[in-house]
Structure formats: C-alpha cells, structure tokens
From Swiss-Prot:
Any one cellular-component term (Gene Ontology): cytosol
GO MF term (any one): 3'-5'-RNA exonuclease activity
Uppermost EC category: transferase
Highest taxon, organism lineage: Bacteria
Sites where the protein binds Mg(2+): D516, D522
Protein name in the entry: Polyribonucleotide nucleotidyltransferase
The organism of origin for this protein: Salinispora tropica (strain ATCC BAA-916 / DSM 44818 / JCM 13857 / NBRC 105044 / CNB-440)
EC numbers, comma separated: 2.7.7.8
GO biological process, one term: RNA processing
Family: Belongs to the polyribonucleotide nucleotidyltransferase family.
Region (Disordered), start-end ranges: 722-785
C-alpha cells in the first residue's frame, strides 16, 4: 500500500532540517479501521503506523480516575521478519512497545476533559518499518490525530518530534544513522497555543552511548543550556505537526459528542469540608515525617466523615475527594505565598543525603543511597558477554550489555499489594535509570562484561527513579566498573497558580511524593558534573513555558552538584573487583582458527572449559572472552587457546613437562602444548631397561619430562625422555631389542615376520619410528626375476 492510497483524506507536515534534509509526515484517514471512533495512518519515510481510538458506550461511574489505555502492537512483518518465539507469533509487548505506550499516554492523558469516565482505548499497530526511521514518535502523532478525529472532548492536537544534537545543530526526526553522530537524543511533545507559541507537555531525553567520545573529540557537551535550546528548536516542528493535524480534523473529524462528566465532588461538599477542617489540615501539613503526617490526615478524614456523613449520606467518596482537594490547595498555597514546603524546606533545599557502598557480602557490587525517606539499594552483577540480553524487537539493536531492573515492592510505601512481574511503571523507571548511566559506561573493549544492575526501592517518598540512578553509580563503582564519570539524579517539581492576577511558577528541588501528587510537574534530571545524561518531564498542565523548564534545568544542575559531592565522599574511584566476580581476559585469534578452538561438535572448547574451570565465549570476529573466578584458571584457558590458535612452534631440543594422553604398543603419546602431541617410542621409555609393556612405566595422566629429538616433514614430533641429572645414558642400542623377538609396533604382517633373518637390525636411534602414528617405516625390496 503506497502513500497515495492509505486514506481518502490526507495532510502532510514538512519539516526542514537544512543541510540534513526535509522530513515529511503524512496523516491519512478514511480507508483503514473505519469502525473505530477515529483512525489514522501516519507515515514517515517507509515507517507506517495505524492508530485507532475507540470509546466505551457507558461511563464507569465507580471509577475515580480516567480509564485511558494505550497499547502498541509491534508486528514483525513490518520489518520483514518472523517472530523468534516457539509459536512464531507475537506475544506479550516488548520493552520498546511498553515504553512507547508510556510516551503516548503521558501527553495524551492531561488533554482530556476532567471527569471523563468512559473507557478510551488507543491502539497503535506498526504496519511497516523503515530501517532509518524509528516508529515511536510517529506513533505519538498518530495517537493524537486518531483521538482528535474520534469526537472525544480532547484539547489536542499534540505534536511530537525527536530532536538530535548533531555537529552543533538540532535535527528533527533524525535517522538511526544520524543518531550515531548525536550527543543528545530528545523526544518532545507539545501543543500549539493561540498566540503562536508552543506549550511543552512531555520530554524524554538522554545522552547517547557515543556522547563521551564525541565530546572528547570536540563536539559540544549536552549542558543545561544546550538542552534548553533543544526545547526551543523543537517548537517549529511541533507547530507544523499540529497544523497538519488540525487541517485534517477540519475535514474528517466527528463532531465532539456529549459525554457525562463525573466531578470528584460538588461545591457544597467542598465548602462544608473546608469550613470544618481547613485549620487542622494546615497544621497537619507542617509535620515533616510522611507516616506521621498521613496518620494526622487520616484522623481528620475520619472526623469529617463522622461529622458530615449524616448530612451527605451516600456521598462519602465526595467527602474524601473534597478533603484531598483541600489538602492540595493548602500545600500549593503555602508554597506560592510563603515559599515553604510540606516538610518545612525552601524551594531549593535538598533532604538529608547518605551514601554507602559494600553493604552486602558475596555480591559483586552493592550500595545504599538515601535521600530523606527515599531509600534505594543498588546491586551490581558482572558476567561474561554471552549473558547479555538478546532482543527480538523491531529495534535495530539485537542485544543489550547493560541491563537495569527496577523493583518497587508495596512495602516501600508501607502498604500491601501485588508482588510479581514488573508493571509498566517499573519498566519505565528502570529504563530511565538505565539510559542515565549508558553514556558513562566503558566500551565492550575496555570492560568486556555483561552488567546487570538491580535497584531495590526499599523506601519511597519522592523520586525513587532518580535515587536509583545514584545507587546504580555507587554500585557500579563498588563492583569495579570504570565509569567515565559518576552520575546523579534529582526530581524537580512545579507549583503554579494565579497570584495577584499573574500566573506564578515556583520550581521545587527534590520533591516529596505528596508534592509530586499535588504539583503540576515531575521533571527528572540526571547527569555528571559536566553534562546532562537523561531527563524526563511529565505534567498535569496543558503545557509549560520553555523558559520555566530552562530555569528548572539550571536549578537541577545546582542540586546535582551537591549530590555528587556526597556520593564521591562514599567512593571516589572504581573499587577492586570482588573475589566472587569473574575475571574476563580477551584473546584475539585468526577467524580461520575459530573452528580449531571449538573442535568437532565443540569437543575442544568443552574440554578446555571442563579442565580449567573457565567459561569461554567466542565472537564472530575472532575475539575470545575467557572468564573465571580466579586468575590461574583463566590463564590456563588462555594458554590452551593460544596453543591451538596462536601456537609457538616447538623446535628440536626444546624440553617440556608433558602429560601422557595415550599409550600404545609402540610407545606413549605425550601432550606438549594444546593440540601438539609427540611420540615417546617404547625404546625410549625405560631409561635403558627392557620394556615389555609401556603401561609398566607410563600411564595416561602421568607427567614426564621430554625433549624433542626430531620433527619430520609432516610435523610429527618424536621425543627422548630427559634423564635425571647424574644418571648415565644407556649404552648405544642397549634398549633396542631385535625386531623379530619383540616386534615392537610392527604387528602381524601378510608376509610373515622377517625378524628372525640374519643379525638383529634394531633401530638406528631416533629415526626408526617416523611413520604416521609412530609406526616403523617398512623397507622397500625389489625382487628381480
């Protein structure tokens, strides 16, 4: 299906990137998914996403939240692939799909009318994937467009663009190839205002894995000023996308339908609660401790229900909602008018900080980071690169070396709840903390380990995700990972309201859980002392002025420096690796020798692993990673591998302490180097004594010191036994016996044994066993007729 027949109506948005070319995003509707309330196909290059928005017929009156669901369906056929699962069918959503769901939900949710209780579902299906263009930002625009067409009370459209900082310029909708040269990658969503400006609604951004190298080579570091300029640079693209969506909506959107709106409470309930409890609530909000404060508020709630319940019978939920609204109002008013927060801090103050490393035995690295009542334990595990995570997604990345898992058990907030597989929130928080550390991780060549970082949220009262960033830095350094720089994170909040006829904004540093719930913004910023590594913005407003966000970035920078000082006091440099962590050694071999190291059916590599206790991983380019928990085991494995693939060829006269690997009637085979055996003939085994049977003197596994006596043209090695110093050498031929009486290795022959004829011929020293496998070379006779 080509661009021209994706719909009956279409509009395009054209974004000019100057030297980086133009990007054309097309919105088409009217042909696909016509039974949905609103459907659209969005296309960028050859990336095609179908978005369908549907709405439930009846409202869910018993819900006290807006039931919006966003699903992203990655179809492997979009990339011309068959799923790698057992059933060869797509299963549960990938992490990329879940993160894209969150990207769509965050700007979409605050754009619906307050009090809507009808179920709304937005389903994004990836129909085709251009290898150059990721689908996630296309899906955000598609979701906005299909929702705008559906007739729902929606304040969109919302435009979203990816911005990359490349060679000092901001590029909209960069390709995967261009992102390799980017120092910063940022997804920005917003809506166009009547005055022509753009209000920012959502930001998801990070420095790239190449940032540190690019900056070292002279590129601009993604400082707070650079990031703020990126928010401004995103506005023209967002404005153009909103224009195209609005034009399509004018000709194809359904009229906005009437939906019942369920307000949390009525004015009469709010007035009664305010009159009864305002002073008590104001006093309770001065309690710094979370548990004590919530206990005091619970007592106020119980009293309000008891005293006002008879008056508002059957409206207990309204009483609770009104009390929550009163609490929110008091929190915000105190901040705006007095510059004092719930726990008594000023807007820029940070809660008490503690950082400690090495808190757990046995593990490879561990740390405990606390910020007020937020407590995060970070645990680091190192392993061979073959333990990195394989990815079967539409992303061009096929594996992930650094894996960050975030766990948020219910006890972290003092509550009961479900424990099990991670929820979308946990996946999102883990991904954010992961992206914050990726720019400072050492390369595979510098540190050939797979790294798993687990953040355990043991206590939660504000920004466990940024606490996880700090705990991860400490844990990685504790494990001996040579980070390029330590990273810290901080969560910023925002309170805004009309004060004396003007909208006033107050940015809060290090927000509490209540400030997150009652505030207008959750703005998380992570970075080093030099630049920003990750940030995330969520807002409950229709948008935030970019100058307010720029000021918040600068305020976050100041807080980050304070946190980094505390962390560096706990650990300044990478610690010595744990005794329980594997030591990985890198060996480079010629590609054509990989088969020799592996051996038939893996026999050689398995034997090396079994005998040395090391783990071996082989890359396609001939790089071999050898891991072991102790140095001698790794060294032994490396020597075995080098002996096979990078051998030092032995020469006549070299001495070895070899191992008997096989015995035969004619002698013993001695292992000198991995893959290099030599023959010690039976005549050389007994130190001058008559030898009837090799096993009387040597058995498999015995160590014996030998010297190379000869190497024939085929590379076969013949050995002499090294006699102890002072021992007399046997007389010439003393150890030799007539071939006819002993027959050595000759065995039966078709022509009979010739040994009885004439005098004993014996061997002439070291040349009589030069045949394959050590057999004597038969003498050729010619019969004359």
């Amino acid at each position: 299906m080509t661009e021209s027949n994706l719909g009956t109506e279409s509009r395009t948005a054209t974004i000019d990137n100057g030297a980086f070319g133009t990007r054309v995003i097309t919105f088409s509707t009217g042909r696909l998914a016509r039974q949905a309330a609103g459907s659209v196909v969005a296309q960028l290059g050859e990336t095609v996403v179908l978005s369908a928005t549907t709405v439930g017929r009846q409202p869910k009156e018993h819900f006290d939240f807006f039931p919006l669901t966003v699903d992203v369906e990655e179809r492997m056929y979009a990339a011309g692939r068959i799923p790698g699962s057992f059933f060869r069918r797509e299963g549960r959503p990938s992490e990329d799909a879940i993160l894209t769901c969150r990207l769509i939900d965050r700007p979409l949710r605050p754009s619906f009318v307050k009090g809507l209780r009808n179920e709304v579902q937005v389903v994004e299906t990836v129909l085709a994937l251009d290898p150059s263009h990721p689908y996630d930002v296309v899906a955000i625009n598609a979701a906005s467009m299909s929702t705008k067409l559906s007739g729902l009370p929606f304040s969109g459209p919302i435009g979203a663009t990816r911005m990359a900082h490349i060679d000092g310029s901001w590029v909209a909708f960069p390709t995967h190839e261009e992102l390799v040269r980017a120092t910063f990658d940022m997804v920005v969503a917003g809506r166009a205002l009547p005055d022509g400006d753009v209000a920012i609604m959502m930001v998801e951004a990070e420095a790239t894995a190449h940032t540190a190298k690019l900056v070292a080579d002279g590129a601009s570091a993604p400082t707070e000023e650079v990031v703020a300029s990126g928010l401004e640079a995103a506005k023209p693209a967002i404005r153009e996308l909103c224009r195209a969506q609005s034009e399509l909506a004018e000709v194809a959107a359904k009229p906005v339908a009437e939906f019942p709106v369920f307000l949390d409470y009525s004015d009469d309930v709010y007035d009664a609660v305010t009159e009864l409890a305002r002073e008590d609530v104001a006093e309770a909000l001065k309690i710094a401790g979370k548990a004590d404060r919530e206990e005091a508020l619970d007592r106020i709630k119980a009293r309000a229900v008891e005293e006002l319940g008879p008056r508002f019978e059957g409206r207990e939920k309204e009483l609770s909602a009104a009390l929550r609204s009163l609490t929110k109002s008091e929190v915000r008013s105190r901040v705006l008018r007095e510059q004092v927060r719930i726990d008594g801090r000023g807007p820029r103050d940070i809660r008490p900080l503690t950082a400690e490393v090495g808190v757990l035995p046995r593990v490879h690295g561990s740390a405990l980071f606390e910020r007020g009542e937020t407590q995060i334990m970070g645990v680091t595990t190192l392993n061979m690169l073959r333990m990195e995570q394989s990815l079967d997604t539409l992303s061009p990345e096929k594996s992930k070396r650094y894996m960050h898992n975030y766990n948020f058990p219910p006890y972290s907030t003092g509550e009961t709840g479900r424990v099990g597989s991670p929820k979308r929130r946990e996946i999102g928080h883990g991904a954010l903390a992961e992206r914050a550390l990726i720019p400072v991780l050492p390369s595979r060549e510098e540190f050939p380990y797979a790294i798993r970082q687990v953040s355990e949220a043991l206590g939660s009262n504000g920004s466990t995700s940024m606490g996880s960033v700090c705990a991860s830095t400490l844990g990685l350094l504790s494990a001996g990972v040579p980070l390029k720089a330590p990273v810290a994170g901080i969560a910023m909040g925002l309170i805004s309201d009309e004060v004396e006829g003007k909208t006033r904004y107050v940015t809060l540093t290090d927000i509490l859980g209540a400030e997150d719930a009652f505030g207008d913004m959750d703005f998380k910023v992570a970075g080093t002392q030099e630049f920003v590594t990750a940030l995330q913005l969520d807002t409950k407003l229709d948008g935030i002025p970019s100058d307010v966000l720029a000021a918040a970035l600068q305020q976050a920078y100041e807080a980050r420096q304070t946190i980094l000082e505390v962390m560096q006091a706990a650990i300044e440099a990478p610690a010595t690796m744990s005794d329980y962590a594997p030591r990985v050694t890198t060996v480079k071999i010629p590609v054509d020798k990989i088969g020799m190291v592996i051996g038939p059916k893996g026999q050689t590599i398995n034997a090396i692993q079994d005998e040395t206790g090391a783990e071996i991983s082989i890359e396609d380019d001939g790089t071999i990673y050898v891991g072991a928990t102790n140095g001698p085991a790794a060294q032994a494995a490396v020597e075995r591998i080098n002996g096979i693939a990078n051998p030092t060829l032995p020469k006549v006269g070299d001495r070895f302490l070899g191992t008997v690997v096989k015995t035969a009637a004619f002698g013993a085979f001695i292992s000198l180097l991995p893959g290099r055996d030599g023959l010690l003939h039976i005549s050389k085994v007994g130190d001058g004594k008559r030898v009837e049977k090799v096993e009387d003197f040597l058995n498999v596994g015995d160590k014996v010191e030998v010297e190379i006596a000869d190497i024939d043209q085929r590379g076969k090695i013949y050995l002499d036994k090294v006699r102890p110093e002072g021992a007399e050498a046997p007389a010439e031929g003393a150890a030799e016996r007539p071939a006819g009486r002993d027959r050595g290795d000759r065995g039966p022959r078709d022509r009979g044994d010739r040994g009885g004829r004439g005098p004993d011929r014996g061997d002439s020293g070291d040349g009589g066993d030069g045949g394959e496998g050590g057999e004597s070379r038969p003498r050729r006779r010619t019969r004359r007729s």
